[in-house]
């Protein structure tokens, strides 16, 4: 822009001079400058820019803009660029439609961008001043707009470009190898031509691309479904999604990833969810039945991509789980073993917990569905609370199960999961109390620690009110041990004899234990009765004012029994009932572990050889139901426990049947435990009805107590609100029906704890 002129003086006198810009410019001068610039622009477009002085061109453009001829320069530029693109570039591209189209277009695009960068540099001052003042497109963008409108969006070029790109992608989807670079270049060009927006790319490529893809995937889904199992279909869809993502990454603009994936998801998953899930011999149920955790995980991952996908899976899983659960708890198997019943439910829960962890990502929806399903079918069977208590009873009893304390702990934790699903927790509590009492009183608990651990679990779950009675039972046992130590010391000190009876008495607090209000009668034999009377006198002397009532149904005894050998057969051989050959007429001694009722019956046979059912009933005064059960255990049990024989030899016990001691009785064991018939099967129907009646009576009191508590604090309440509040308070123990609550409210009104308001009969007030 400047030149140095030679001076005659010393070096100091040499000065740099800037050539002055003309003050005014006539039209002729302006035209000559424009011609110079126009020629330069055309040379740049023809790639003949090596001879141009960019410095001079910049100065000329600067001069034009400075003297207010920016518009002429801007308009002229637009015309020159437009002319070149129409006459030269567009023609070249049109000529290449059937031969190297994308390469030609890409070359033209690259040349145009290079030219526009040079032109922009020359006209930089116009960009800074004229463009800013007049709010028009800058030089480079102007070039892009003209290229877009005159070349890329020119009728047949636009159509051909779109079709070429779509064809190449369609071919690649079918497995052909295509020029990915050419696709990428074209897509980048369309994005740049949108001038920082994506409208050109979207309209000229993306929208038709998505439309074509939808049609393609629609057809592909039909083909995939017809030819593949659910698991293979899922893998193919997964592969298709990954392929589309990879194509976007290498060929298209990143912004296309989301919409194309949505198209794949809609066409290959959303539209066929039910079909995939319900596929026969390969769908969700097939996977659940056969424990295919990996296939389920793939299905979960795929379905989690689409709206309602997991809901569809959940619904199908739920109907299968409910079907399985209902089969387990169905009433059909009346002789169902409670331990097997609960174990079946625990196994089912374990299976679905595994699916939840390994396949369903511990998803909340699946978790809630599984919990809801278990709650649904567990409560279909009214025996579930009793059976759960019997299951826990089985695990907490001493026995040859070979379980470590840790294994027992794990089983109890699983049982607690079922307990949480149980609506009638008060029924469970009643049975648990019975079974715990039996374990404690027969010294059958595997360990005190395990028992207390279980009570602590129940306490955590339901609060101390739920377990206070159970804890009271343990306190009674501890106090009883101390009392028995004191009693034995008293016997030693006084020299009183119990007549050969080794007596252990457990003194139980009535409110804690499942004692019976009307204690079953029983004429205890003289020897144990005498021993107990000595204890009674000792105890009441220490605790005046207390009353001791024998609970025969909860007691047990160890009897020394002598059997006098088998009967000789006609051939002279001797055989015992158990099938073991016995020689000689040697007697066999056993200790029989029996209930108080069984002891009372067996001790009769010290006096006489035979008794009829009626005679036993008369002598013992045992209630008929208890007597039948005791005799069945003694005379109709396993051969290794059959210490009595009866005539006739039927399973039933009826009046007129005759009982004798079975002198052929043999057992490999010295101590023989006489099992109570059907003890593991839970209660009989009459017993169950009785328990249910007791539960209902307890519930009446609990419901009334809750109503009074609520009304005392709220003073006045509308009927429906009170019912809802009572239900909320009691649901941790049982679900009271609104009808029962209404009856209890009416009972309280009759007893004047509550009153109806005169203005509204459905509103109650608390009567202090």
Curated annotation (Swiss-Prot):
What this chain does, per the record? Answer: Core component of multiple cullin-RING-based BCR (BTB-CUL3-RBX1) E3 ubiquitin-protein ligase complexes which mediate the ubiquitination and subsequent proteasomal degradation of target proteins. BCR complexes and ARIH1 collaborate in tandem to mediate ubiquitination of target proteins. As a scaffold protein may contribute to catalysis through positioning of the substrate and the ubiquitin-conjugating enzyme.
Q: Which Pfam families match?
A: Cullin, Cullin_Nedd8
PANTHER family named among the record's database cross-references? CULLIN (PTHR11932)
Main localization (coarse) = nucleus
Instruction: Provide this UniProt record's keywords sorted from A to Z.
Output: Acetylation, Cell cycle, Cell division, Cell projection, Cilium, Cilium biogenesis/degradation, Cytoplasm, Cytoskeleton, ER-Golgi transport, Flagellum, Golgi apparatus, Isopeptide bond, Mitosis, Nucleus, Phosphoprotein, Transport, Ubl conjugation, Ubl conjugation pathway
Name the Gene Ontology molecular function terms of this record. cyclin binding; identical protein binding; Notch binding; POZ domain binding; ubiquitin ligase complex scaffold activity; ubiquitin protein ligase activity; ubiquitin protein ligase binding
Q: In which pathway does it act?
A: Protein modification; protein ubiquitination
Start and end residues of each stretch annotated as Interaction with KLHL18: 2-41
Q: Which organism is the protein's source?
A: Rattus norvegicus
Q: Where is this cross-link: Glycyl lysine isopeptide (Lys-Gly) (interchain with G-Cter in NEDD8)?
A: 712
Question: Region entry Disordered: which residue ranges?
Answer: 677-698
Q: What is this protein called?
A: Cullin-3
Matches recorded under PROSITE patterns: CULLIN_1, CULLIN_2
The Gene Ontology biological process terms listed for this entry are:
anaphase-promoting complex-dependent catabolic process; cell migration; cell morphogenesis; cell projection organization; cellular response to amino acid stimulus; cellular response to oxidative stress; COPII vesicle coating; embryonic cleavage
One GO cellular component term, please give it.
mitotic spindle
Q: Which residues carry this modification: Phosphoserine?
A: 585
PTM comment? Neddylated. Attachment of NEDD8 is required for the E3 ubiquitin-protein ligase activity of the BCR complex. Deneddylated via its interaction with the COP9 signalosome (CSN) complex.
Q: Tell me which family the UniProt entry assigns to this protein.
A: Belongs to the cullin family.
């Amino acid at each position: 822009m400047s030149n140095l002129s030679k001076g005659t003086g010393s070096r100091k006198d040499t000065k740099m001079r800037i050539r002055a810009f003309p003050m005014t410019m006539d039209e002729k001068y302006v035209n000559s400058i424009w011609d110079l610039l126009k020629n330069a622009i055309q040379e740049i477009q023809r790639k003949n820019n090596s001879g141009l002085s960019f410095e001079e061109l910049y100065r000329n453009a600067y001069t034009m803009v400075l003297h207010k001829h920016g518009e002429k320069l801007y308009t002229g530029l637009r015309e020159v660029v437009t002319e070149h693109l129409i006459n030269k570039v567009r023609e070249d591209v049109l000529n290449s439609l059937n031969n190297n189209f994308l390469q030609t277009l890409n070359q033209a695009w690259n040349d145009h961008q290079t030219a526009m960068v040079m032109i922009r540099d020359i006209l930089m001052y116009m960009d800074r001043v004229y463009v800013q003042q007049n709010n028009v497109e800058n030089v480079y963008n102007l070039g892009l707009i003209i290229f877009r409108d005159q070349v890329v969006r020119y009728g047949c070029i636009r159509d051909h470009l779109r079709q070429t790109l779509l064809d190449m992608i369609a071919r690649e989807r079918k497995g052909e190898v295509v020029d990915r670079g050419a696709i990428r270049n074209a897509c980048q060009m369309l994005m740049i031509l949108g001038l920082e927006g994506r409208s050109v790319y979207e309209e000229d490529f993306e929208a038709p691309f998505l439309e074509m893809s939808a049609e393609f995937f629609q057809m592909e889904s039909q083909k995939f479904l017809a030819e593949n199992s659910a698991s293979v279909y899922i893998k193919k869809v997964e592969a298709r999604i990954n392929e589309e993502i990879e194509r976007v990454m290498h060929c298209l603009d990143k912004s296309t990833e989301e919409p194309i994936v949505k198209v794949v998801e809609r066409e290959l998953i959303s539209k066929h969810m039910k079909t995939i899930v319900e596929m026969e011999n390969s769908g969700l149920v097939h996977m659940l039945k056969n424990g295919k955790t990996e296939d389920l995980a793939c299905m979960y991952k795929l379905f989690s991509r689409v709206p309602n996908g997991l809901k569809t899976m959940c619904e199908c899983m739920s109907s299968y789980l409910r079907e399985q659960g209902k089969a387990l708890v169905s009433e059909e198997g009346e002789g169902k073993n409670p331990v097997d019943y609960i174990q079946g439910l625990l196994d089912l829960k374990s299976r679905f917990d595994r699916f939840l962890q390994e396949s369903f990502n511990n998803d909340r929806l699946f978790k809630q569905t599984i919990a809801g399903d278990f709650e649904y079918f567990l409560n279909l069977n009214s025996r579930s609370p009793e059976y759960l208590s019997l299951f826990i009873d089985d695990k907490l009893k001493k026995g040859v199960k070979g379980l470590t304390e840790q294994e027992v702990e794990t089983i109890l934790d699983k049982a607690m999961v079922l307990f949480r699903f149980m609506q009638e927790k008060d029924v469970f509590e009643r049975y648990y109390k019975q079974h715990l009492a039996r374990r404690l009183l027969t010294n059958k608990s595997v360990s005190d620690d395990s028992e207390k651990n279980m009570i602590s679990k129940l306490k955590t779950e339901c609060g101390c009110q739920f377990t206070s009675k159970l804890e009271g039972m343990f306190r009674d046992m501890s106090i009883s041990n101390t009392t028995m130590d004191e009693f034995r010391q008293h016997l030693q000190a006084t020299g009183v004899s119990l007549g050969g009876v080794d007596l252990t008495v457990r003194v139980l607090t009535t409110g804690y234990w499942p004692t019976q209000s009307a204690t079953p009668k029983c004429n205890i034999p003289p020897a144990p009765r005498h021993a107990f009377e000595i204890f009674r006198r000792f105890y009441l002397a220490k605790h005046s004012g207390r009353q001791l009532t024998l609970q025969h149904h909860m007691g047990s005894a160890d009897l020394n029994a002598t059997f006098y050998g088998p009967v000789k057969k006609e051939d002279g051989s001797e055989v015992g009932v158990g099938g073991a050959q016995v020689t000689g007429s040697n007697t066999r001694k056993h200790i029989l572990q029996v209930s108080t009722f069984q002891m009372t019956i067996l001790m009769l046979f010290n006096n006489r050889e035979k008794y009829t059912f009626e005679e036993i009933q008369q002598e013992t005064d045992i209630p008929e139901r208890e007597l039948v059960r005791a005799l069945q255990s003694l005379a109709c049990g396993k051969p290794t426990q059959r210490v009595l024989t009866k005539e006739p030899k039927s399973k039933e016990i009826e009046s007129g049947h005759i009982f004798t001691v079975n002198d052929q009785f043999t057992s490999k064991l010295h101590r023989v435990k006489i099992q109570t018939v059907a003890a593991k099967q839970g209660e009989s129907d009459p017993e169950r009805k009785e328990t249910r009646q007791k539960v209902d009576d307890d519930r009446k009191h609990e419901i009334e107590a809750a109503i009074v508590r609520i009304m005392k604090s709220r003073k006045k309440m509308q009927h429906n609100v009170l019912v809802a509040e009572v239900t909320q308070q009691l649901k941790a123990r049982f679900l009271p029906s609104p009808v029962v609550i209404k009856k209890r409210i009416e009972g309280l009104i009759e007893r004047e704890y509550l009153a109806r308001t005169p203005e509204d009969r459905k509103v109650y007030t608390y009567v202090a």
